[in-house]
């Protein structure tokens, strides 16, 4: 396996063709140091949520700080096992028997989403991996209903009033994934207390509890000490090993999507068209209607533009931003905080060029992680032609 030391060394930023993602090693390590401290004061273990960030080319930076990976599908399980190591947790909203057989020999924990799946496949897991079940506690913290695991008619986890209490005698652990971008430590502690009160007598029978992801402990001003104390108290109260499954918390504010202005048009408002698209390269901007932020923008700027994509989707735009000076064709812009749920969702809509991926090392060296070309685009559409 190639490493960062083997490929793409000694590159200069000015030579890089847009669009591309630039991962900043120093910023990544700053987040990881916070994670390390939280682990030390709380005793919690952390597994990286690959659904959020799977760019394995930088896993050598992350591995010394975390305990392994957690996955939402069989290919993520394999990727975590092969490229990260440590503990490999396997979870899926819906397993097939083939899926279970495919990963059971390489995972340490297998977590089922329902009691029916647990009953159907537990015989394949017992003796090979620690057995877990996802519980939906009916409480959550999420800014948008689309990402709320406790939303009405949720399919995520076993509803509290549907649990067969005997199940806790034959599993090793449970997962409660109930947060999305939770920056409020008191709100999280409130969720912890609710879980302890409602499920405590069951948790006392278990070996481990995963509290999922979505806890934004690296957000500026977050009270990590308070979080650590609450996690430690919970683990001691129920005599369990606690896990967190951070994704965004690890890679937030580490990565820019760098684009170039290719045209400027006007239809009631100026639009700077860039060589990228939210539909293809930053999908959550479109899905959640959360405008991106641009490094070069200024709140007090006098020149306002829509930062529009080059896709054919009429509403595909990154944001509206103000600038101190008029934008120029050929100018580069940095779309900030573009690591989480971006590279894992890249697609070939419109046949647009896929962004390359680079890492800026602590010493300033630029190293290539990935690049894509026409053959990659063609291969995703067909490998064979009908006869």
Swiss-Prot record:
GO terms for cellular component: cytoplasm. The keyword Zinc does not apply. It is an enzyme of class 4 (lyase). It is found in: Cytoplasm. GO terms for biological process: lysine biosynthetic process via diaminopimelate; nor-spermidine biosynthetic process; single-species biofilm formation; spermidine biosynthetic process. InterPro entries: Ala_racemase/Decarboxylase_C, Nsp_de-COase, PLP-binding_barrel. This is Carboxynorspermidine/carboxyspermidine decarboxylase. Substrate binds at residues 248, 284. The keyword GTP-binding does not apply. It catalyses: carboxynorspermidine + H(+) = norspermidine + CO2; carboxyspermidine + H(+) = spermidine + CO2. Homodimer. Disruption phenotype: Abolishes sym-norspermidine and spermidine accumulation and results in substantially increased accumulation of diaminopropane, whereas putrescine levels remain unaffected. Disappearance of norspermidine and accumulation of carboxynorspermidine. 50-60% reduction in growth rate of planktonic cells and severely reduced biofilm formation, which can be rescued by exogenously supplied sym-norspermidine but not spermidine. Not required for colonizing the small intestine in infant mouse model of infection. It comes from the Bacteria. Its main location: cytoplasm. GO terms for molecular function: carboxy-lyase activity; diaminopimelate decarboxylase activity; protein homodimerization activity; pyridoxal phosphate binding.
């Amino acid at each position: 396996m190639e490493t960062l030391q083997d490929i793409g060394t000694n590159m200069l930023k000015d030579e890089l063709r847009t669009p591309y993602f630039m991962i900043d090693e120093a910023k990544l390590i700053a987040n990881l140091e916070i994670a390390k401290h939280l682990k030390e004061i709380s005793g919690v273990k952390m597994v990286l949520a690959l659904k959020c960030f799977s760019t394995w080319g930088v896993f050598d930076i992350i591995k010394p700080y975390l305990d392994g990976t957690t996955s939402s599908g069989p290919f993520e399980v394999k990727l975590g096992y092969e490229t990260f190591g440590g503990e490999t947790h396997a979870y899926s909203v819906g397993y097939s028997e083939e899926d279970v057989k495919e990963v059971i020999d390489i995972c340490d924990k297998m977590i089922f989403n329902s009691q029916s799946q647990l009953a159907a496949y537990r015989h394949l897991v017992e003796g090979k991996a620690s057995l877990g079940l996802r519980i939906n506690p009916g409480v959550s913290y999420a800014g948008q209903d689309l990402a709320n695991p406790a939303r009405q008619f949720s399919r995520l986890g076993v509803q509290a009033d549907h649990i067969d209490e005997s199940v806790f005698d034959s599993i090793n652990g449970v997962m409660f994934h109930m947060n999305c971008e939770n920056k409020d430590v008191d709100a999280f502690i409130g969720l912890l207390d609710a879980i302890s009160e409602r499920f405590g007598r069951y948790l006392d029978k278990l070996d481990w509890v995963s509290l999922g992801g979505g806890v934004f402990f690296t957000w500026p001003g977050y009270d990590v000490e308070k979080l650590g104390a609450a996690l430690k108290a919970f683990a001691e109260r129920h005599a369990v090993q606690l896990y967190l499954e951070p994704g965004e918390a690890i890679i937030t504010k580490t990565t820019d999507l760098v684009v170039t202005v290719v045209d400027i048009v006007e239809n009631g408002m100026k639009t700077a068209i860039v060589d990228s698209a939210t539909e293809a390269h930053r999908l959550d901007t479109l899905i959640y209607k959360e405008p991106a932020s641009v490094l070069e923008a200024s709140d007090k700027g006098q020149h306002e533009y829509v930062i529009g994509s080059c896709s054919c989707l009429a509403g595909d735009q990154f944001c509206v931003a103000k600038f101190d000076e008029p934008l120029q064709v050929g100018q580069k812009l940095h779309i900030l905080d573009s690591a989480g749920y971006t590279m894992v969702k890249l697609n070939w809509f419109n046949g647009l060029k896929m962004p390359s991926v680079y890492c800026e090392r602590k010493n300033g060296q630029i190293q290539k992680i990935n690049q894509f070309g026409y053959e990659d685009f063609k291969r995703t559409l067909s490998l064979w032609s009908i006869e």
